[in-house]
């Protein structure tokens, strides 16, 4: 009985909240901006779905049940011999041919993605020369005229539709838009995060130490910022082969500068505050003062810029791809699709698709950025 009484009178253990009271108020301010809050969820949903683009748009089935065994062509390569026996000779199966589809229907089943085209799949059964209009704009006879058996061909079905048409190389526009969305957001996120790390570190060093350190770095940044980025890209593109990481590295050389000024100003303002002098008097090292005491306050201004920097990074990649200075030819690129729309004005579905994807993506990021700015506004947090 005494043990039960002791346990009953024992005070509950304190559990530290996940967010501090200040950050809880900021989160409530962010949620109060309904447009920005729901824009964040919509953007995250679209981004997470795009990470699984191979399961949404692919010229391979997701799963195949064939003669009592299950296979995952979306992940693994299988030879044609597995499905066609001695009649198969290709080391990697082309799942769009009629014989493969007939083998699946006779000996099992195949689970296909919603879009049966990858970003690089060429559709050879178009009703007219590429770029062709969305399939739902044609009659059944027009859609099936390029197939061997016409309207009776099993390949002429709803699953092989090009819902948003094809580009000038007979590739599915919807598939390229899905993959292009993913690569644009990934490029922007990586570039923004790396730029923030470098820019915040440089700005913190300048603002905290001041003196000659600040003076020399400021002169270097002034010279570095005056370099013509476009001409440097032209020169490097002529020397090095185009690639995702090469382009990211080139852009990173110049993007980090945008973070330095804000962080530097915050450190210059706060480095002589009383709590910083008290930490020095207690023997706290410079690194601990920078990262534990000054950086959290300086990051408030930096975080409000991140959605807009991400927005600018995506726009920059699209612009470079539009000019032919971005990703390698054939990559899933919104800028390359936009250039095709400019060169094929008779195919308005190309430009309209890119316009809708870009305007939606950039608008969502702007709404999120406005909500983040309101969340960190001291007048709303402490008012």
List where the protein language model places each region.
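Alpha-helical transmembrane segments of integral membrane proteins
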Residues: 166-383
């Amino acid at each position: 009985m005494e043990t039960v009484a002791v346990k009953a009178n024992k005070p509950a253990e304190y559990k530290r909240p996940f967010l501090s009271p200040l950050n809880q108020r900021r989160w409530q301010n962010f949620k109060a901006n309904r447009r920005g809050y729901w824009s964040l969820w919509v953007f995250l949903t679209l981004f997470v779905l795009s990470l699984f683009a191979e399961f949404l748009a692919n010229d391979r089935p997701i799963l195949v049940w064939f003669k009592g065994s299950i296979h995952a062509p979306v992940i693994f390569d299988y030879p044609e011999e597995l499905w066609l026996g001695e009649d198969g000779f290709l080391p990697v199966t082309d799942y769009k041919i009629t014989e493969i589809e007939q083998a699946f229907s006779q000996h099992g089943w195949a689970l296909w993605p919603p879009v049966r085209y990858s970003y690089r799949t060429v559709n050879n059964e178009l009703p007219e020369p590429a770029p062709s209009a969305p399939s739902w704009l044609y009659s059944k006879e027009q859609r099936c005229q390029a197939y061997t058996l016409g309207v009776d061909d099993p390949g002429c079905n709803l699953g092989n539709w090009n819902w948003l048409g094809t580009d000038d190389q007979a590739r599915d526009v919807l598939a390229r838009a899905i993959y292009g969305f993913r690569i644009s957001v990934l490029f922007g996120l990586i570039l923004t995060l790396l730029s923030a790390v470098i820019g915040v570190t440089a700005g913190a060093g300048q603002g905290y130490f001041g003196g000659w350190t600040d003076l020399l770095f400021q002169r270097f940044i002034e010279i570095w910022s005056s370099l013509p980025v476009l001409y440097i890209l032209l020169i490097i593109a002529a020397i090095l082969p185009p690639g995702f990481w090469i382009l990211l590295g080139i852009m990173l050389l110049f993007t980090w500068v945008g973070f330095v000024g804000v962080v530097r100003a915050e450190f210059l303002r706060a480095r002589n505050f009383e709590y910083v002098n008290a930490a020095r008097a207690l023997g706290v090292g410079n690194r601990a003062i920078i990262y534990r005491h000054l950086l959290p306050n300086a990051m408030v201004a930096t975080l409000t810029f991140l959605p807009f920097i991400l927005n600018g990074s995506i726009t920059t990649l699209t612009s470079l791809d539009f000019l032919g200075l971005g990703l390698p030819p054939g990559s899933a690129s919104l800028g390359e699709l936009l250039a095709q729309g400019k060169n094929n004005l008779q195919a308005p579905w190309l430009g309209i698709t890119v316009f809708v994807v870009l305007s939606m993506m950039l608008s969502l990021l702007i709404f999120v950025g406005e909500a983040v700015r309101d969340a960190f506004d001291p007048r709303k947090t402490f008012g």
